[in-house]
């Protein structure tokens, strides 16, 4: 970090005094100064971040006696969100742990006055608060709820944010502990907590992860802010109130007049006002709740526009630059937060600067290749290394550039208007319905990026041509700059192109013990992932679950048990195990428990960048991911490799190649047999009917007496014993050889059915 700061200061000295094109015309001078200004401001922002990250303060969870936990009101603000989203959230709330649950008061704060929300509140046995007017938007809604409740602490959740079972236990402990300490201190020595902010994470891939085919390669775009930036601000008491997943003291809210209603980012403003009053606020880096990230580009742009306008408006109205009630470190952090939203202009200038020179012949920076290698390169490399190290491999400069390039065309005008006091009059709630836009409705969002791509290609061509014409390598600097920007632009175009959404429900990684039964056989296994529409379970042995019949699945976690009804939709191999995927047709009487188990176990999004991936991989994935794929298989019964020589009742010798309970693949020489009876062991005979030929000597037969065998528990046990004998009895090497041949095919459709569940 010190090395980077030193090189950055040296670089700035060189840039300020030696590189501004003062003799190349007014356009060059303006462009050169604009680039220099955004570089200086960006580096000041980086220095603030370096200061914060130099000695991070992680609040230690205190030990609190059960009787010391105070009363708390849980407010879930809603306006027009779908009922199924509200159900998940309130279900998470009612399952939160607390020593005395009578001290937890949960309320729907309904700004839409909807009958169905009131009915849901009654069904879940929680409070319901509505209001007839919408004055003050979300802040007004929460203030109205405050006037009707009385607990000393208030937990706020957005309508889609599902708390985990330990949310209150891991947030309220700080307040309870501080209360106890304050009782032993005189008033002037007491420390009063304002709020505890926990990360806002998401159980669905955000648009950057999903549209760029990187769900398993990059963390959620917001993770860096909530898990690193926020926690780093603890030591300066400048943690930003994020509006959800937070516990606030009623006293602090009353001291600042409630939630701030004069900004469309009421959370940002309210947090600043609380800290102005001297309250101490902490951010935690442990995920205690998860929500639904915007699922379409229009909603994402609307959300970021509101955040940008709201932060700039708040900075202006609360006089962040000159207020005496904030310490210098607090002012610096909040000003950096406001400046962050001008990244759209910074990104535009970074992209246009090399284009101005290479495409239009306008000089922006006056320098030589040697100077760039001496002053810029060490600063650039050390900055990249610092960001990666300080972010704990959550964020890199490359991905920051991609995120900014995607959004900058849509934020430039709103931030400019807000800077001059032309504010957004109407509060827009971010759409979070789980549906996605059609690709043909979003192409026009890519027009700015397409124009810049064309200009960049022209500039790249000119640099290459000039290099060959002059024999000089000075143009390599501009060429590198253009290619770097072009990569970001191409990734932005890929992002805007979107990606078709197949899933109706988000699928979570859930590893819990399960039992499956059809009333004839019962199998025990371990779940792998689950959604509201389906679940996949690993079994040690194949089981005869008919895809045309219903099965009952019981899933257990450390506290609850859920029993649901479904049917098998896909069976594949996973190593030496069998993966059964079931659709869920009915949650029976276990909906609350099943929903809780799914969302409380949320762990499936990546928390770090995939270090093995490169920019080439990013482009390759986005090209191949958009290539139509064929699904080769859709197996709903386990296909079991077998190598058993058997004689039919007529004396014909055949070899069983594989078996899936309903069909049998045989190989034999000689005349084709249209039908035969095949005894596998004593008391177990298969009645076969010819279906088709595969190759020269392989024949597929249907098992005509499958229904009778399937419904007979004794026959089922004989079949299982026969499979174990011939699958593992000296044939493992043969089986593995056959499995490897099919591995590529199976991998292509392993989750094909689950994609829609």
Please provide the spans of the model-predicted regions.
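Basic/Trp-rich segment in TM-proximal cytosolic loops or flexible interdomain/linker regions
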Residues: 1, 18-30, 51, 55-64, ...
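N-terminal membrane-anchoring/stem segments of glycan-assembly enzymes
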Residues: 1-68, 121, 344, 468-497, ...
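Long helical/loop segments within the catalytic core of UDP-sugar-dependent glycosyltransferases
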Residues: 52, 129-153, 165-264, 276, ...
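Cell-envelope/extracellular polymer assembly enzymes that use nucleotide-activated donors
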Residues: 71-73, 105, 269
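Short, acidic, metal-binding catalytic loop of nucleotide-sugar glycosyltransferases
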Residues: 91-103
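A conserved acidic beta->alpha catalytic loop
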Residues: 109-117, 133-134
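The conserved acidic donor/metal-binding loop of glycosyltransferases
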Residues: 158-162
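Structured alpha-helical
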Residues: 438-757
